[in-house]
């Protein structure tokens, strides 16, 4: 069995747009669950969710790319960018690179 080493972490969720703010909110016992604001929920029985509301995809992609790329991919790109910075990657070596991702929907 080969060893696996986690060298960088990137997070984006309803509690924070990066790992530091996410961990801080978790340690403070906060929840990201609140009333849904990103779309009309009047026809749905559930009115709450853990939405990511403060993320601006234009901070990582240009206008054309934002329109072409689904939101869950935008979020993945943001988290991946943070993980690569956290790992102090200088150059990309694809054969040494792996990604573990978790999402509620997407």
Segments from the language model and where they lie:
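Conserved "HGTGT" condensation-loop signature of ketosynthase/thiolase-family condensing enzymes
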Residues: 1-106
């Amino acid at each position: 069995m080969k060893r696996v080493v986690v060298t960088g972490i990137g997070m984006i969720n309803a509690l924070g747009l990066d790992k530091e703010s996410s961990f801080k909110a978790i340690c403070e016992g906060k929840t990201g669950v609140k009333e849904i604001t990103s779309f009309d929920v009047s026809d749905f029985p559930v009115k709450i969710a853990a939405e990511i509301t403060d993320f601006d995809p234009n901070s990582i992609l240009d206008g054309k790319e934002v329109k072409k790329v689904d939101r869950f991919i935008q979020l993945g790109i943001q988290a991946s960018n943070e993980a690569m910075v956290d790992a102090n990657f200088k150059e990309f070596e694809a054969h040494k690179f792996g990604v573990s991702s978790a999402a509620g929907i997407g």
